[in-house]
Amino acid sequence: MAEELLLERCDLEIQANGRDHHTADLCQEKLVLRRGQRFRLTLYFEGRGYEASVDSLTFGAVTGPDPSEEAGTKARFSLSDNVEEGSWSASVLDQQDNVLSLQLCTPANAPIGLYRLSLEASTGYQGSSFVLGHFILLYNAWCPADDVYLDSEEERREYVLTQQGFIYQGSVKFIKSVPWNFGQFEDGILDTCLMLLDMNPKFLKNRSRDCSRRSSPIYVGRVVSAMVNCNDDQGVLLGRWDNNYGDGISPMAWIGSVDILRRWKEHGCQQVKYGQCWVFAAVACTVLRCLGIPTRVVTNYNSAHDQNSNLLIEYFRNEFGELESNKSEMIWNFHCWVESWMTRPDLQPGYEGWQAIDPTPQEKSEGTYCCGPVSVRAIKEGDLSTKYDAPFVFAEVNADVVDWIRQEDGSVLKSINRSLVVGQKISTKSVGRDDREDITHTYKYPEGSPEEREVFTKANHLNKLAEKEETGVAMRIRVGDSMSMGNDFDVFAHIGNDTSETRECRLLLCARTVSYNGVLGPECGTEDINLTLDPYSENSIPLRILYEKYSGCLTESNLIKVRGLLIEPAANSYLLAERDLYLENPEIKIRVLGEPKQNRKLVAEVSLKNPLSDPLYDCIFTVEGAGLTKEQKSVEVSDPVPAGDLVKARVDLFPTDIGLHKLVVNFQCDKLKSVKGYRNVIIGPA
């Protein structure tokens, strides 16, 4: 009788498997695999080698606290002649004496998470069990049988592997790209993402069921949407929108997700202060990409927050056009969420592909502050019965806006406002380039098209179907040049009378600082004049906005809302026009000193010219970049920076990965907040 087969050790082939599974950056000390794909391991036996005629090898793979075959969290499989794609299986690749090389495969629908892999070796009546090691299983966008399969290699690299990108802010007329370090492969981030799944209330309530359901990216996307905010659980970020961030970090100051996720883990899963929509979206993007789900951050300009699902945002104003009160139903200057790519077997055919997921806590969905995933195609088609939260997302891009002017007797009159259209310039980063891609067409049919009317009819969007009133008088807000921080500048109310009648009007122009979510701040410029509009004439009325007026009340959004209200007393009519202005921050210049080689020290010199007429105090540069720095670095500049002078600092870098990387920089001081910059750095081999 053959002697017992004893295992000496197991080589999980971490580096080789990491290269094959596009997880090399994660495979420093642990094996990280993508499901549905073959991987290799090598067994070293003591005394004698494996003999197929007398030895039997059976493998076990388990995940979660209470694994079971029924839940899909436990598997037993024997060595076979060939690896079976799409199931737990193993076969021999090669044998040299006591060394056995094996090939194994996981199912394309296996739950993701941490697995323990074991081996039972039996010879006759003798048998021994061995723990071969642990591995982490992720979703696989390269596997056609996986629910997150994406058939474009360029898109897989952008939406799964790329660690830096852009988030779009500013205003619909001045779109601002903000660099962001997603850093999904940075040290400790994968463990933090798995911890996030284990902290979600569904896991704490029923651990076995939650682990089983992690096979579905739909389920995991919904969990991540809830866990990135902390409104119902021990989630990552606490939201705040009142411009008081003294006991935390301003949402505008963040430049990446890595620091946020590390803070959350290091402080015992306590909320990180503070986030706003793009921070929630960026952290969700990091987590979902890390878990293997193709994901991108999306910005919707003029985004509606409709609480009662009537697809209508109503503003009530006094006779001067001023809002009677700030309210929860608002038009946000912009709003960010993420889209993740997956199949939707729970929905009708055609609703697979990009799914909107919104982690910003706005409204509850099934009792939890989360939103989505909802098919972007379903939004475009106006199919509001689609899971999950289709009415809310449809309203974000399609709601109508009505302005009511309250009269002296308390009655209200409807004002005409052609300047505010919800759901414009929906933006995301282009694939493989540092450019913006407009994806509005994926959410909406062209304005005025028969398809648009059909969608509005299906969605019962009666207000959008109503005929628009025409008066023959039009007004829009135009801007001049030099809309930069520290400058005085002019804006103009451009008024056209396209009728044969003379119109006697009163124009009220007002500029106020505004937060990106539509909450107004103090006034920083006004004009009140009487106008005679001649037949078929055009007029342009300027409003001067002074730095001394806006400097003390501008929020970190750098936004000013200009409102024009044209009143025609004889006709008792009101015409409203608005425009949000974004004030450009000064440019951060970045120089890289030294030869950019792997594992060789580099120095980044960052500088900024003070554009203001006042000195700058408390200046600080913060930099980070996946593959360039292990952690975020900050440099304080103690001396005041006189008007027109440069503020400059140097930061040491130690690049560990070859290829293209982005160094992301933030600058803060007493008078300039959240100035962003970046530089692409190509690191060559040592």
From Swiss-Prot:
Active site (record annotation): 277, 335, 358
Principal place of residence: cytoplasm
Pfam families per record: Transglut_C (PF00927), Transglut_core (PF01841), Transglut_N (PF00868)
Top-level taxon of the source organism: Eukaryota
PTM note: Disulfide bond formation inactivates the calcium-dependent acyltransferase activity. Cys-370 can form disulfide bonds with both Cys-230 and Cys-371: formation of a disulfide bond between Cys-230 and Cys-370 facilitates formation of the disulfide between Cys-370 and Cys-371, which promotes inactivation of the acyltransferase activity. May also form interchain disulfids between Cys-230 and Cys-370. Ca(2+) protects against disulfide bond formation and inactivation. Auto-transglutaminated: Forms covalent cross-links mediated by transglutaminase between Gln-632 and the epsilon-amino group of a lysine residue of itself or HMGB1, forming homopolymers and heteropolymers, respectively.
Key word Hydrolase present: yes
Disruption phenotype: No visible phenotype in normal conditions. During apoptosis, mice display defective clearance of apoptotic cells in the thymus. Moreover, inflammatory as well as autoimmune reactions develop spontaneously with age. Defective clearance of apoptotic cells is caused by an impaired capacity of macrophages to engulf, but not to bind, apoptotic cells. Mice also show glucose intolerance after intraperitoneal glucose loading: mice manifest a tendency to develop hypoglycemia after administration of exogenous insulin as a consequence of enhanced IRS2 phosphorylation.
GO biological process, one term: positive regulation of sprouting angiogenesis
Function description: Calcium-dependent acyltransferase that catalyzes the formation of covalent bonds between peptide-bound glutamine and various primary amines, such as gamma-amino group of peptide-bound lysine, or mono- and polyamines, thereby producing cross-linked or aminated proteins, respectively. Involved in many biological processes, such as bone development, angiogenesis, wound healing, cellular differentiation, chromatin modification and apoptosis.
Full protein name: Protein-glutamine gamma-glutamyltransferase 2
Name of the gene this protein is made from: Tgm2
